Design a protein with these regions (language model features):
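RNase H-like (RuvC/DEDD) metal-dependent nuclease/polynucleotide-processing core
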Residues: 1-211
């Protein structure tokens, strides 16, 4: 990751279970306090750096046209479906905490922030802040980590950064008709007026299983 690009990820949950990781240049570090991360990201944006913010929770859901499609997993999720009990819990925390972080960034930033979900536009410099989804499955979790929530955020951020280094970040889930909750938060806090992204999926990054 270059000095002008910041990759961060948040493992959402109850306040005592939040963890985050942030990478910029050769520096990286994490923590448990969301407000600390907000302060760092505001400083990054004010310094002209781009921020790619990953949320370890479902940030969009399918938008089926028939009842037979309701409550179905997204293609590629496997046993980590958004509609399973753990997925719906993470979705709820993710919606609230994504909105909290984006609203705090918008409120404290010294300039307007161009937010969105289009990773190609972000890499081309058209966005200041990108929201992406982290899908950390059981095999990618470090069970021996002293801070497992920070460790989950770290493995997600590192995988996104690895893909950025190749110049292309592809999603590990298939697309389709969706309702994007992260996009709703981006619009709600004034980072964009582009309503078409409400119907578009974010890029989803699934770190590989640990060796």
């Amino acid at each position: 990751v270059t000095e002008n690009l910041v990759v961060a990820a948040i493992d959402v949950g109850s306040v005592r279970n939040i963890g985050w990781w942030r990478i910029t240049g050769s520096n990286a570090g994490g923590g448990r306090d969301l407000d600390e991360l907000v302060d760092l990201l505001v400083a990054d944006l004010n310094a002209g750096r781009q921020v790619a913010l990953g949320i370890e929770a479902p940030v969009y859901v399918p938008a089926p046209v028939a009842t037979s499609g309701l409550g179905r997993a997204r293609v590629g999720e496997g046993n980590r479906a958004w509609c399973a009990s753990a997925g719906t819990s993470a979705l709820g925390f993710g919606v609230q905490e994504t909105n909290y972080v984006l609203r705090a960034i918008a409120r404290h930033s010294g300039r307007p922030v161009r937010g969105g979900i289009d990773v190609d536009g972000f890499l081309a410099g058209a966005l200041d802040l990108l929201v992406w989804e982290a899908l950390v499955t059981a095999g990618a979790k470090d069970r021996l980590a002293p801070e497992p929530h920070i460790a989950d955020a770290r493995v997600a951020a590192e995988e996104f950064a690895t893909r950025v280094a190749t110049g292309r970040v592809e999603s590990d889930l298939e697309g389709g008709e969706v309702f994007n909750l992260a996009a709703a938060a981006i619009i709600a806090v004034g980072m964009s007026t582009e309503t078409s992204m409400l119907r578009a999926p974010c890029v989803v990054v699934r770190p590989p299983a640990l060796a």
